[in-house]
Amino acid sequence: MTIVTNLGFPRIGARRELKRALESHWRGETDATQLQHTARELRARHWRLQRDAGVDLPPSNDFSLYDHVLDTAFLFDAIPQRYHGLVDADPLAGYFAMARGRQADNIDLHALEMTKWFDTNYHYLVPELHRDQHFALRGNKPIAEFEEALALGITTRPVLLGPVSFLLLSKTVDGSNRLDLLERLLPVYTQLLRQLQESGAEWVQIDEPTLVLDLDAQTQQAFRKAYATLNQGPRPKLLLTSYFGPLGDNLELALQLPADGLHIDLVRGTEQLDAVLNTLPAGRVLSAGLVNGRNIWRTALDNALTLARYAQGRVDKDHLWLAPSCSLLHVPVDLEQEKNLDADVRNWLAFAKQKLSELRVLADALDNKPEAETALTQTRQALEARRQSPKVHRPDVAQRLAALTPDTTRRNTAYPQRSQAQQHTLNLPAYPTTTIGSFPQTLEVREARAQFKSGKLSESDYEAFLKAETERCVRTQEEIGLDVLVHGEFERNDMVEYFGEQLDGFIFTKLGWVQSYGSRCVKPPIIYGDVVRPAPMTVTWSAYAQSLTDKPMKGMLTGPVTMLQWSFVRDDQERAQTCRQIALALRDEVQDLEKAGIKVIQIDEPAIREGLPLRRGEWADYLNWAVESFRIASSNVHDTTQIHTHMCYSEFNDIIEAVAALDADVISIETSRSRMELLDAFVKFRYPNAIGPGVYDIHSPRVPQEEEMVLLLKKARAVLPPEQLWVNPDCGLKTRGWKETRAALQTMVHAAQRLRAE
């Protein structure tokens, strides 16, 4: 019988039960016991769901209260000194302080840095290490969760982040080489593997996703050393797991490592199958990632079955396992909950539960079970209906794309001339202050939106409520003394969803939530067809907000690359083509904002770096169309209109030329967690336009001291001309409360005023 396995399951629950439990605990409404009870219930539910879907070997230790990389650091006692006292007194509180920061009871701790998990929309906490780092087992989470499943009658495969990837995903605070710590880390892994074996685990999934990256000789040697060491002690069988791309030139290395099985991504790396089969050692299990763990489209089962049958004929009997390409963490839980979705589009989709069923169908087909044919036929019919659907293809969009020229992507004049025209129009002080866009989405705002959507609040009453919130936001900013204002975005549920709801070619689920980080969940739009803007999307609210103040009001848009990256994107055409379609829709919106008197327009591109292919050799093509798309959206304005953009979590050294090529008049970037380290790229490159380095971390409720912000601004001023500098938070303020927001922004304005006075 063909084995069906899974690499990971969504943690949050089909109805975001984990999010609610976490936030209740953080508010002090529930204690740790109640939180852990919810966590146990979710794990049990998910294991049973996988078993019932036909998964023979589901994972354990894929669950996390916040983040699996943080879990790994915590498990191995890689806890920075500043958290030791709290962790020793209350481990769970210390764990959450590492994730979120903590400012209470005379404790003032900032959080670990957060960044994107490879090129996905999930975020992980970056472990902080140093040259004298000590590792030791703290707790027994992987063993406890394996035994928890066993008590339910379900045998699982514990998941561990592998030692080399753990180090490569970490940062050292003293400039030392992360891989030099491998010697100290391996004994702890060896100890853990021995304990898992003693607990009865037959297999352990050891994730080494960095195997799909460009690796230098030192890193390749670290892999050899690590797995030679792990192979010496007693251990369960190891499934060496790669995902997010082909192994490429690391294939030989991966097959040399002494593991008992190898998982490969055959969605993003279909071309690697032959090379793997030609060199797979006898007796080694091949886990074939045939179902896309990152997107929500039904699998072309006939194509997947062809690959599976080909592999089946080349590996030892019972040594072919079927799996998703990666963990299902990145997709919603269950399509069956979507009762009101367009029936045609719904028939083209598969969420986590459905993807597991697809794997069971493939396994049954391989085993020649007749019941598989019905499901295969249904899939063929659904895919053909999608290919032929007029909902997907629009001739007017194709005509507009064909009419694009180089002039479509150019501003009228160069930045030096534009900046003079803008300063003449805007008359801003030195170190101008602004925010990134959103203001706190309070419970009242969320409840009003929910009541409006459910029909309990009339459109006129909802509009009156939003106008009052917008005016309060504008008045608050004026009182604080900000220079360029925003309207607060109270009418928006999400920075992508809000636009997607107003664009043809997008569709939305009701419960299609995926985890972004911690309790933060997003409901990505689904781009199923050609994109068109039927009507203006933001002009009414931006113009209303501008009518309330004499200060400049920013129009706020989400950029084409970010809308693409943060959506589930159609897989029947190149991503670049879909991105250009979105850019043309935004181009029309930018033009309408300018006509309405909006003189500052921000086109957020926080996701531009995460779209980079994992292999450097593929970067140029992506950056070309990403920059082109931004410029399509932003270039049809007068010199006096100031174009801003914003980027998150980015390391800029290797893409700084592309960032400059966007030709935004002002770029704001997230720098506070990295203590302004990210500015180095702009300094070395001599970035010509204006920059707003974030001076405080909005992902934490902590209110920083004025002196901290002044110090960060002085660090920025030491390396960049003062006339280039703007002052702003790291990111939008949607998830923060009003009290801390007002206090932090007032402190930020005071910091800017101090620099102006010097």
UniProtKB/Swiss-Prot annotation:
Note describing how the cofactor binds: Binds 1 zinc ion per subunit.
CDD domains: CIMS_C_terminal_like (cd03311), CIMS_N_terminal_like (cd03312)
Keywords tagged on the record: Amino-acid biosynthesis, Metal-binding, Methionine biosynthesis, Methyltransferase, Repeat, Transferase, Zinc
Keyword Membrane: no
GO MF annotation terms: 5-methyltetrahydropteroyltriglutamate-homocysteine S-methyltransferase activity; zinc ion binding
Binding annotation for L-methionine: I436, G437, S438, E489, D604
Pathway noted in the entry: Amino-acid biosynthesis; L-methionine biosynthesis via de novo pathway; L-methionine from L-homocysteine (MetE route): step 1/1
Binding site for L-homocysteine: I436, G437, S438, E489, D604
Sequence positions that bind Zn(2+): H646, C648, E670, C731
Cofactor(s) required, per the database record: Zn(2+)
Principal EC category: transferase
Binding sites annotated in the UniProt record for 5-methyltetrahydropteroyltri-L-glutamate: R16, E17, L18, K19, K116, R520, C521, W566, E610
Active site, renumbered: H699
Enzyme Commission identifier(s): 2.1.1.14
A biological process term (GO) from this entry: methylation
Family recorded in the similarity comment: Belongs to the vitamin-B12 independent methionine synthase family.
Role of this protein: Catalyzes the transfer of a methyl group from 5-methyltetrahydrofolate to homocysteine resulting in methionine formation.
Protein name: 5-methyltetrahydropteroyltriglutamate--homocysteine methyltransferase
Organism of origin: Xylella fastidiosa (strain M12)
Lineage: Bacteria, Pseudomonadati, Pseudomonadota, Gammaproteobacteria, Lysobacterales
